[in-house]
């Protein structure tokens, strides 16, 4: 007998629906155990997936997927969904080079109805699908599953506002709330109420009553207010009712005896409906229940012993460099304010939040607000530091231009996860920031080559009386220990790190080590350019005058990046050398180990050498 007898019978939701409902709790136990075993071998998101086991089973058991559309917000909680939809064996290659994604992908499965990874998009997408079904005369359902964190973002409420006026669509929004728990009395009561409010008898009575009371609008309004008042006394759903949704819950998201009948009832109803379920991150794995943050995103580990603290000195990361610098500068200047859009741990702000709680602001998943909030602080003489991932800064581009750069406000950006981030893949690579930042007036853009340079650039940005950004990669670099002393770098000035002949490598940021290795084989000059904006035009002109080939290197898409700006400088020269621009290709790059990804795009040292030799042969030039 296989170790997971029920789970091994399921290769699609069609197999799942053949099970007797009484078998579902046992299936949930098997699925949870399989997740723990599988993710401990591959790494990935664990706590959130353990919290959605029963919900994943119930949705595919009740709804006619993939005909009915399920859109998972963010999508890092979809491993159970993937396993139930034919990808159980593929989990052994989860988030690995050439393997399946850790997020929903339309190209991966017809059950992945919408690609997600950035938050708060599910309701908008599901609404679009629901409207499409209505316009085609189709009866299929659209379901958006959104977490309480993602629910806090403005885009989610924009979608609710739009959907609430549409009475002729089949849309169900499920709030997966894992920030609270249900006490037994409330849980028992709300389970009954969710069944009652979602049941056919109750809703038929509601419609009949509305028809009768419709002849007397004041009585109809009074009846609705009484209903809302009674529900509001025992449920937190008043807000969603105000948006035009019928609210049900909260119910226990781990209780299949509550989920199954409630979803069965909701499937029969038309219009916009909102189901509130309470789940627990790490459910069923005591170590993850005790510390869901530690087990949120994991590397490989022994699931019987749990995650162990690494022995010896850990590799220094750029994120740690930023976190230490922020605490150091905040101790010197009480006007420094730290801001993050829901990325305290990932951005290295845990220590700052503990030591300077009155100057720490986690604004939630609200990148647009984070930037304009920072702009307001800057207007009043404070020094806001926005710690944000490169991929999430994209969501606040208008605020960056209109609210900060246009007014030349001294807002500082610590941009983490620039370049290729690894296992999170295309949705999280910081592949575009040099392109979309380099065109903004007033903005200074820096890219450190090592950890110490990162610290000095952060200080340079802090000292600059205008908007400034420091972009650095995920993980560690050349392991150059940061100096305690801080000194501002001359803005717009690079440096020569190696002198050579005929070929000059102009490096912007994290590829310096690879460039130095390549230069040894090519006897090339290596320039650490440091600043993407403003460029060191003088240094470029000097290198152009003394070399036959200039090669730009950046961990950013080639189109519109630093290499494009170097090309613009060379255009003004009457006698200019050849130019080769190396960077990320014009495609979305999949997931995998960072070193594997760099090799795949030719930005490791051998790839750099090969690209240059294909373009330039000293004997023929």
Curated annotation (Swiss-Prot):
Pathway: Metabolic intermediate biosynthesis; 1-deoxy-D-xylulose 5-phosphate biosynthesis; 1-deoxy-D-xylulose 5-phosphate from D-glyceraldehyde 3-phosphate and pyruvate: step 1/1. NCBIfam families: dxs (TIGR00204), PRK05444.2-2 (NF003933). Binds 1 Mg(2+) ion per subunit. This is 1-deoxy-D-xylulose-5-phosphate synthase. Keywords: Isoprene biosynthesis, Magnesium, Metal-binding, Thiamine biosynthesis, Thiamine pyrophosphate, Transferase. Its EC number is 2.2.1.7. One of its GO terms (biological process) is isopentenyl diphosphate biosynthetic process, methylerythritol 4-phosphate pathway. InterPro entries: Dxylulose-5-P_synthase, THDP-binding, Transketo_C/PFOR_II, Transketolase-like_Pyr-bd, Transketolase_BS, Transketolase_C, Transketolase_CS. It comes from Aromatoleum aromaticum (strain DSM 19018 / LMG 30748 / EbN1) (Azoarcus sp. (strain EbN1)). Thiamine diphosphate binds at residues 76, 117-119, 149-150, 178, 285, 367. Homodimer. It comes from the Bacteria. Disulfide bonds: none annotated. The lineage of its organism: Bacteria, Pseudomonadati, Pseudomonadota, Betaproteobacteria, Rhodocyclales. GO terms for molecular function: 1-deoxy-D-xylulose-5-phosphate synthase activity; magnesium ion binding; thiamine pyrophosphate binding. It is an enzyme of class 2 (transferase). Mg(2+) binds at residues 148, 178. Pfam families: DXP_synthase_N, Transket_pyr, Transketolase_C. Its cofactor is Mg(2+); thiamine diphosphate. Gene3D superfamilies: 3.40.50.920, 3.40.50.970. It catalyses: D-glyceraldehyde 3-phosphate + pyruvate + H(+) = 1-deoxy-D-xylulose 5-phosphate + CO2. GO terms for cellular component: cytosol. The keyword 4Fe-4S does not apply. Belongs to the transketolase family. DXPS subfamily.
